[in-house]
Amino acid sequence: MAGLPHSPHAVVTGAARGIGREIAATLTRAGAVVTALGRQNAALEELIARGDARFSAVADVTDQAAVVAALKEAAARRPIDIMIANAGAAESAPFAKSDAALFKRMLDVNFMGVVNSIQAALPSMRKQPFGRIVVIASTAGLKGYPYVSAYAAAKHAAIGLVRSLALELASTRITVNAVCPGFTDTDLVAGSIDTIKKRTGRDHAEAMAELTRHNPQGRLVSPQEVSDAVLWLCGEGASAVTGQAIAVAGGEI
């Protein structure tokens, strides 16, 4: 299987924890030069100290000006070849109680954060002979789940962006894809389990079962399984794969 080209520069947003941290480490092990972007400088520096990233960039993906400045600095160090738009957040509420502020928060980070990251990276990427854009979406971008209508709407929007941008860039050497994890063993899902316990009175095992029942394999996905899918999409062997939303969810989708 064809791997990464020689030492590409990859920017990973939301790299301080969870799936983003695993993606940064996986790409680094595969030979990429990784810039880890996030809001928490201490966590990013820890990533670098472990050897799982080369550079850090502090920015909130919802702040367009901050993202542009951070990626301009990153591109000055080394032109950008790979953009992994991973940063995201989830909140749950019944639709009737999902106010405009909740929808705006979910769209700002899960959709506009993706837009801001890609737009800031593209000027550098267009000058390169190789390019990969991978958006970390969710199975919630491919189907519905109750009580997360704002989150699901934002993830559906992100996948729509991927499909449209892939066609727009098809004549270039830049591919655009989404990876859509099911419920994954991260802090974000741990928070969801705590929420289920508080709202329903269920114990940990029962709350976990509420999530794993969606996965035909009866388990949570691991961050490494998600990062392995990302690594494949970033490789030269995936040059003909673009505009796809690939579920990593044990057969749920």
Where do the model's predicted regions map?
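Conserved glycine-rich cofactor-binding loop
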Residues: A16-R17
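Residue(s) in the substrate-gating loop at a strand-loop-helix junction
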Residues: S138
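Short, small/polar-rich loop/turn modules that mediate ligand/substrate recognition or access, typified
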Residues: A170, T175, V241-G243
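C-terminal substrate-recognition "lid" of short-chain dehydrogenase/reductases
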Residues: Q217-V248
